[in-house]
Amino acid sequence: MKIKKKYCGHVIIVGKANVGKSTLLNNIIGKKISIVSRKKNTTQSNITGIKTEDNYQSIYIDTPGVVFDKNNNQMKHHKNNFYQTTQIATLIIFIIDRIDWTIHDEIILNEIKKTKIPILIIINKIDKISNKIILLPFINFLKKKIDFIEILPISAKKISNLILLKNIIKSYLPENCHIYPECYITTNSDFFTVSEIIREQLILFLGDELPSIIKVEIESFKKKEKIALYIKAIIWVKNVRQKSIVIGHNGEKIKKISMISRNNIEKKFYIKTHLVLWVKDKN
């Protein structure tokens, strides 16, 4: 019997903050593995998603949105991570927001061009473009920048052109053994998953009030047989003022955040969960 060839490679998703990288990743994988919000820089660290279909395995890395210094337009936060991640890439997906090409997109493009790795451009959120005719001149404008393997307009939310996107990605995967078992969809640890579930609720409840430096630390994670999960987590903020914002009047905000986080953890792990949240400041 002829053995099927296997294909496997890393696909890096890059772009400015809030262009839809995490939404795209979730839709490709078919499960929510990366939190999504309108707040910039929701993704704080690399999120790895794995999609195995037949003899093809794509390992996606959703990188934090590239942040720029307001004074000189230089890349700052996550810059080293940006370079390190591209070292293992088979393909780079560069996402841009509709036809909004800025100097920051130009800088990102110039950086990823240096890697000599094939680049696929995705024009996201096309559902928000009422006059689709304007897409053609914009695509022609992009074609003059570099010889991209493809320029694909999509709506990550509405999953338009997703099958075409997957087929393009498969065509660039090298012949290789699969790195992960077929059942794997992410390399995220349970600790990380829980901290992200909590952080998502902090973002949703606090919105613009949310301190940008907020971090969630899982202090303990204990499973009592298959009966219950006991979790203690610390929400770290910078100062007392930020602490009061997170807690809310009479503790109302933190109670709601805790309740919904607990429910979402139970849905994720299919087990009754006891969650204790502490808000601490670093001063």
From Swiss-Prot:
Residues 124-127 are annotated as: G4. Residues 41-45 are annotated as: G2. GTP binds at residues 15-22, 62-66, 124-127. Residues 62-65 are annotated as: G3. It is a peripheral membrane protein. Residues 154-156 are annotated as: G5. One of its GO terms (biological process) is ribosomal small subunit assembly. Its main location: cytoplasm. Gene3D superfamilies: 3.30.300.20, P-loop containing nucleotide triphosphate hydrolases. PANTHER family: GTPASE ERA, GTPASE ERA, MITOCHONDRIAL. HAMAP family: GTPase_Era (MF_00367). Monomer. This is GTPase Era. It comes from Buchnera aphidicola subsp. Acyrthosiphon pisum (strain APS). The gene is era.
